[in-house]
């Protein structure tokens, strides 16, 4: 697989782990914080499964980039957990691979993006970032938590064009099977999940549930409890 450079096309991408519509686990089978439990329906993807899948994604990414230096953009705040775990595995695989190297594999950058209030897209994208002009002529991998409608990544990739980046690829932990999806595909995907609003593993509902270890479904009571007062 060559280094991807057609954002949204998902050319030559490996298949994600498919989570069926009726898959999931009883909350009582896992350690769930008491202050969250009543607001959740079920565990969709357990923490251990998420971690192992991220390790495999790191392995796939390393195979594609080999020893080419690339820069990783973390889209905060939802991608924080995925990003941190991915970097840990990428570093270990690179540092202890059979091929000796005298340089680090990647640089890391952080971009704050926001496009949701409650469980709905606001239709606008707020971007706060460091100076990204250093990315000119570089390979860039965008790390996103979830592709829902795909609108966020379309707008963000458009925003990046002014920096004259050499290649742009996308890694996301989850892609949601929703009729609202615009067809934007990632190059590295962890899981394909049903059309439900998910929280946990840094995914939030109005900044709540980020510290939940597992990927879970939030129920209507939870949405009502933590609903923002205005869009």
UniProtKB/Swiss-Prot annotation:
This is Hypoxanthine-guanine-xanthine phosphoribosyltransferase. The active site is at 148 (proton acceptor). Keywords: Cytoplasm, Glycosyltransferase, Magnesium, Metal-binding, Nucleotide-binding, Purine salvage, Transferase. GO terms for biological process: GMP salvage; guanine salvage; hypoxanthine metabolic process; IMP salvage; purine ribonucleoside salvage; XMP salvage. The gene is LACZ. One of its GO terms (molecular function) is xanthine phosphoribosyltransferase activity. Belongs to the purine/pyrimidine phosphoribosyltransferase family. Its EC number is 2.4.2.22, 2.4.2.8. Homotetramer. It catalyses: IMP + diphosphate = hypoxanthine + 5-phospho-alpha-D-ribose 1-diphosphate; GMP + diphosphate = guanine + 5-phospho-alpha-D-ribose 1-diphosphate; XMP + diphosphate = xanthine + 5-phospho-alpha-D-ribose 1-diphosphate. Mg(2+) binds at residue 204. Pathway: Purine metabolism; GMP biosynthesis via salvage pathway; GMP from guanine: step 1/1; Purine metabolism; IMP biosynthesis via salvage pathway; IMP from hypoxanthine: step 1/1; Purine metabolism; XMP biosynthesis via salvage pathway; XMP from xanthine: step 1/1. The lineage of its organism: Eukaryota, Sar, Alveolata, Apicomplexa, Aconoidasida. PROSITE patterns: PUR_PYR_PR_TRANSFER. It comes from the Eukaryota. GMP binds at residues 77, 144-152, 176, 204. Binds 2 magnesium ions per subunit. The magnesium ions are essentially bound to the substrate and have few direct interactions with the protein. It is an enzyme of class 2 (transferase). Its cofactor is Mg(2+). Catalyzes the transfer of a ribosyl phosphate group from 5-phosphoribose 1-diphosphate to the N(9) of hypoxanthine, guanine or xanthine, leading to IMP, GMP and XMP, respectively. Plays a central role in the generation of purine nucleotides through the purine salvage pathway. The keyword Nucleotide-binding applies. GO terms for cellular component: cytosol. It is found in: Cytoplasm.
């Amino acid at each position: 697989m060559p280094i991807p450079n057609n954002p949204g096309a998902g050319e030559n991408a490996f298949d994600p782990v498919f989570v069926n519509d009726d898959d999931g686990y009883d909350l009582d089978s896992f350690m769930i914080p008491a202050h969250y439990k009543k607001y959740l329906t079920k565990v969709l993807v357990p923490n251990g499964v998420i971690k192992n899948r991220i390790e495999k994604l790191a392995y796939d990414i390393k195979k594609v980039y080999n020893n080419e230096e690339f820069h990783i953009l973390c889209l905060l705040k939802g991608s924080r957990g995925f990003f941190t775990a991915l970097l840990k595995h990428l570093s270990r695989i690179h540092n202890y691979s059979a091929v000796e190297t005298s340089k680090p594999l990647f640089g890391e950058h952080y971009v704050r993006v926001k496009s949701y209030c409650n469980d709905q897209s606001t239709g606008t994208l707020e971007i706060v970032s460091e100076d990204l002009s250093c990315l000119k002529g570089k390979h860039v991998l965008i790390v996103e938590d979830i592709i829902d409608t795909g609108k966020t990544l379309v707008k963000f990739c458009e925003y990046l064009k002014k920096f004259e980046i050499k290649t742009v690829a996308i890694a996301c932990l989850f892609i949601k099977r929703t009729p609202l999806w615009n067809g934007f595909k990632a190059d590295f995907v962890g899981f394909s999940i049903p059309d439900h609003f998910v929280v946990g593993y840094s995914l939030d509902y109005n900044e709540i549930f980020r510290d939940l270890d597992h990927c879970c479904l939030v129920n209507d009571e939870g949405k009502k409890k933590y609903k923002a007062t205005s869009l």
